[in-house]
């Protein structure tokens, strides 16, 4: 569960309504793979990830980034039940994919950077603080099934 004030919730949902999930999702996942290259090992089937340009223009990275942000959107609709919302994804990433749960935190922080880049002055420190709460809550929910 993420505890947001009414003002924080309005800031998060208001900004999110303007997010282009296709664009931001691909950019966020791409940046994760470039900035933290060890995360690429989970994406062997994505083809060429050999350079930053290859990563950022990879159609599979873009498609998966969109999928990730669509899941994040579901989380925003269920802030009071993030663990339930992400239970199956947590199980998948833990039991089948063996993703280090620290990567969820990294992706959340990269997403915040991408949002700041896209929204500039509209992404105020108050909006950032609210988003940091949300991405921390989502990362925690995704790590829930880990032993």
Curated annotation (Swiss-Prot):
Cross-referenced InterPro entries: Globin (IPR000971), Globin-like_sf (IPR009050), Globin/Proto (IPR012292), Hemoglobin_b (IPR002337), Hemoglobin_oxygen_transport (IPR050056)
Which residues are annotated with the PTM S-nitrosocysteine? 94
Keywords tagged on the record? Acetylation, Heme, Iron, Metal-binding, Oxygen transport, Phosphoprotein, S-nitrosylation, Transport
GO MF annotation list = haptoglobin binding; heme binding; hemoglobin alpha binding; metal ion binding; organic acid binding; oxygen binding; oxygen carrier activity; peroxidase activity
CDD domains cross-referenced by the UniProt entry: Hb-beta-like (cd08925)
Provide the GO biological process annotations.
hydrogen peroxide catabolic process
GO cellular component term, pick one: blood microparticle
- The answer to whether keyword Acetylation applies is yes
Keyword Ribonucleoprotein: yes or no? Answer: no
* PTM annotation (Phosphoserine): residues: 45
User: Modified residue N6-acetyllysine is at which positions?
Assistant: 60, 83, 145
In the record, which positions carry Phosphothreonine?
13
- Tissues expressing this chain: Red blood cells.
Q: Which SUPFAM superfamilies does this chain map to?
A: Globin-like
* PROSITE patterns xref list: GLOBIN (PS01033)
Give the highest taxon in the source lineage.
Answer: Eukaryota
Globin domain segment(s): 3-147
Q: Which residues bind heme b?
A: 64, 93
Modification sites for N-acetylvaline: 2
Family indicated by similarity = Belongs to the globin family.
Q: Assembly and interactions?
A: Heterotetramer of two alpha chains and two beta chains.
Which purpose does this protein serve, as stated in its record? Involved in oxygen transport from the lung to the various peripheral tissues.
By what name is this protein known? Hemoglobin subunit beta
């Amino acid at each position: 569960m993420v505890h947001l004030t009414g003002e924080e919730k309005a800031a998060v949902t208001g900004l999110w309504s303007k997010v282009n999930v296709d664009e931001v999702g691909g950019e966020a996942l791409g940046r994760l793979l470039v900035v933290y290259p060890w995360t690429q090992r989970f994406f062997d089937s994505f083809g060429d990830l050999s350079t930053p340009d290859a990563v950022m223009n990879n159609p599979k990275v873009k498609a998966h980034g969109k999928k990730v942000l669509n899941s994040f959107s579901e989380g925003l609709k269920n802030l009071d039940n993030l663990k339930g919302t992400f239970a199956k994804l947590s199980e998948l990433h833990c039991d089948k994919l063996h993703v280090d749960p620290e990567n969820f935190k990294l992706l959340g922080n990269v997403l915040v950077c991408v949002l700041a880049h896209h929204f500039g002055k509209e992404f105020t420190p108050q909006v950032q603080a609210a988003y940091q709460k949300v991405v921390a809550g989502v990362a925690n929910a995704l790590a829930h099934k880990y032993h």
